Every structure is written in C-alpha cells, then in structure tokens.
Amino acid sequence: MAAPQEESLLARCEIPIIDLAHIGTDVCPMKSVVRRIGQQLFNALSTKGLAVLVNHGIADEKLKAVYSDLDNFCALPENCQAQYLRNPVNNHGYVKPGMEQFDATAKELRHSFNITSLSAASMPAQEEVPEFTQHAIPLAQDLTNLSRVVLQALAYAVGVAPTALLASHSGMLTADGRNPSTMRLLYYPPVPPEDEGYCCQADAVHYTRCGAHADYGTFTLLTQDSEGGLEVKLNGSDKWQKVGHLPGAILVQAGEFLAAWTANVLPALVHRVVVPSGAYARARGRHCVAFFCHPDNDAVLPTLPLQAAAAPPPPTFTPHTHLTLHHRLLNAAHHLQKRFRETYA
C-alpha cells in the first residue's frame, strides 16, 4: 500500500516546476528556450529559493543503479570501506556517519560518497562493487551537462553573456583538480519505529539525518527516491517546511556563492534532513544524488550586474560572515576550504 502523501511544499504546489523539454544540449542549446527557462529559474529562486526541473533527460534507471551501488558499498566490511575514505585534499571519497557534522548537538545518520574525479582508479574496485564506475561516471557527466545548461540560463536571466558563467565553471569534474564541483551519492539508512530503539520519540532530539546548513557553491541539483525528511526555511521565514517528493524531478537551489554574487537576490536556503515521522517513512532508507556546482578555484567574481528589482531581506540564518553580499571580490577556493574545516571532524 502506498504511503499517505504528507503535507509539503510540493503537495501544496508551492515550488515552481520548470520544464526543460526542447532545450537542446549544453553545447548547442535553443537560445529562446534557455532565455525562457532562465527567467523562470530566476523568478523561482528569487521568490521561493528553489525550483523543480522536469523533462531534464536523465533516466531514472541511471539513478536507481547508483543508489543500488551505494547500498552495496555500505554493506562492505569496514576495512574495505576504509580504503576509500574522503581525501581532504580533493574531497573525493567515502564519508562515513559522523565524519561530517552540521549539527553538533545530534548524531547525523548518513553515508555519502563524494565524486570529484572521474578517474576509475578513484572509484571502488570492480570486485568490491561491480559496475560502480560504469554507473557513476555517465551520471556525473549528465549532471555536469545539465549544470552547464542551468549556468547559461542564469547568465541570460542576470544580464550577462552565457559564456561568462561557463568560463568560471569550466573545470567541473576535470582530473586537474581546478574545480571542486562534486557529485555526492547519499544514503540515509532506515531507523526503528518511534516507540523503540534509538531515535524513539524520547531520544529523537539526539539524532538527525543531516543538520541545518546552506550549500556552499553556485547551486545544487538534487535527486531523491523518497521524501524522507528534507525540510527548508523559505527566504525570510523561520519556519521549517517539508519539501516533499516528485518522482523523476530534480530540485535546484542556490548556494552561498550565487547568493553573494547577486547581493542575495538569489538566496541560499537553509535546509536539513530530519528523521521522519511515521512507520513507513522510517522503515525505508532514503537515497539521493546531489550535484554541487562550484566555480573554478581561481575564479574571482564580482557581484553580477542584475537586471532585477531590489533584493529581498537576507535570510535569518547567516553564519558565514566572511561572505560579502556587497560589491567585493570573492575567492572560491578560500570560501570552500573554510566551510570544509567547519563541517569535517
């Protein structure tokens, strides 16, 4: 029996849905369609802070394959997993529960595998997780291409040449390490029912799936196989709201860099993943793929020349005081390394 639909932003039709059909490719997009999508995306991110992309061309079978591969990786003995632990130099590799912490008051229950290089040598071995590399690399390439389309759409919307943002993001997932963009595979394991074990109602305050934070980069593309606890604070609000789940869709939201470039016209929403209520949601794991689109390490970018109305009030959650929202230059690598130091144990 299907789980009942929880009250959520998607269920209330409060997240704009953007149709990418007929947009073409990242190399040769349809300019008129890209302009339209850019304006829709700008309107969505400036008013709601997030949007949903449909007809994006990434097959659900590709996502299911990497979800299964991550399950198989998480089932390996710890000594096998340890060979692939995250490299702090390039952010590539396995992040076991507890390594990355956004909420110091709660244990965060998740596994993730960061992919910052498409080299087969950096992936789990074929004999340990068959086809991990064969599944992960094409998906990473698809999400990179989709990110290039989004960058061109945003460029049109803010009044700059589409090549401007492409040039500052030219190194996504290249082997030379000049760009920290990351495809992250995420698995949130099931938790016991609310009346027993850890995460019971009396102890739930000590556990979460992912603590509150805003993403660090330009924007994030997110796929998910179920609702599973994702919540956001809409711009100017202190209220946590469930996002919900639209099968086959990709969520997009701005990161701290895009917020800084646009003087917070396109704000970076604070979000978290909580341990869900209800037996059905708790008994199943949650899988996601997040593609964090970042500028190149040496990109130094001023505020964009927006053709837009005045910015909305800044979000109430603003812990990153080193990020300016004014006409000051911002270095991508410095910002990212600072944020990694704050979140990795």
Indicate residue ranges for each PLM-predicted region.
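C-terminal flanking tails of non-heme Fe-dependent oxygenases
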Residues: 1-103, 133, 137, 144-345
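A short, charged helix-loop
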Residues: 112-135
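Core domains of carbohydrate- and sulfate-ester-processing enzymes
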Residues: 101-111
